[in-house]
Amino acid sequence: MSCLTGVRAKADLFAVTMADSDSLTADEVIRLLALAVHPEGGYYRETFRDSTKAGERSASTAIYFLLKQGQISRWHRIDAVEVWHWYGGAPLRLQIRNAEEPIETVLLGNNLLKNERPQAVVPAQAWQTAETIGAWTLVGCTVAPGFEFAGFELA
């Protein structure tokens, strides 16, 4: 088997796995990923905390974050840049309010032809809120410097 064939086989396996995940319920995803309730709404689990330091805190952190239908990520802001990554389920509507600028709406998802994007960047101190537009959405959030609840503020 050539290296390229192996890569294609792995890509096909990933596609099948992601397609299969769409048949899961939100509660099954929460259980399989061992997610816990998040104070802003939804469910999360920290998956990475960089051992490299940026001053007194970790250089970066990453979480899984899931919203069920009817749940919202309440308006909040953090003291660091946050990158949202779409992983599965329905698209997610992310709204960002930075200073006096109008609210920016980003649709996270995998359908580029419907203006969905696989990631979005929220600047430090920008207000943000999110909601799924289906049964559930699984995203990841990467924060740099690393997330600390001391730098988290709910509206």
Put a short name on every predicted segment.
Residues 17-121, 127-130, 134-137, 141-155:
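Non-catalytic, conserved peripheral segments adjacent to functional cores
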